Amino acid sequence: MSSSQVVRDSAKKLVNLLEKYPKDRIHHLVSFRDVQIARFRRVAGLPNVDDKGKSIKEKKPSLDEIKSIINRTSGPLGLNKEMLTKIQNKMVDEKFTEESINEQIRALSTIMNNKFRNYYDIGDKLYKPAGNPQYYQRLINAVDGKKKESLFTAMRTVLFGK
């Protein structure tokens, strides 16, 4: 089996593992999971899909197309040569090996298995400090959207710290 085929197979394993990775509870502009899936789907030779499983046709040019445009032309869109060289130097050229992808698979699986959370267990002394034992629970409830504070309880928390 050629090395590129081995890299593709490893990237497919990584994409499958990333698809099992839970979505962020707090929605950001860019999700780690989504960015990594799109990145390694390209390496694995798989088509990009949206949340519903439909294939996405890429409207944007790929990184290789941009590089070829820059290499073929002396000054596209009125850019001077200095600017082009700066752009070329900043572009990331990812060359994956089987070993590097397997390292990523190992790292992601340890994160998903909560290996270090279990290894470095934090006791109740940190989660429920003596001065304000409900502090972290109140934050977690606010993030999850379970229990909202009223204006009175919010003012009490600000004034008295509890």
Swiss-Prot record:
The keyword Acetylation applies. The modification Phosphothreonine is found at T97. One of its GO terms (biological process) is mRNA processing. Keywords: Acetylation, Mitochondrion, mRNA processing, Phosphoprotein. InterPro entries: Cbp6. GO terms for cellular component: Cbp3p-Cbp6 complex; mitochondrial matrix; mitochondrial ribosome; mitochondrion. It is found in: Mitochondrion. It comes from the Eukaryota. The modification N-acetylserine is found at S2. One of its GO terms (molecular function) is ribosome binding. Present with 2130 molecules/cell in log phase SD medium. This protein is involved in processing of the 5' terminus and the intervening sequences of cytochrome b pre-mRNA. This is Cytochrome B pre-mRNA-processing protein 6.
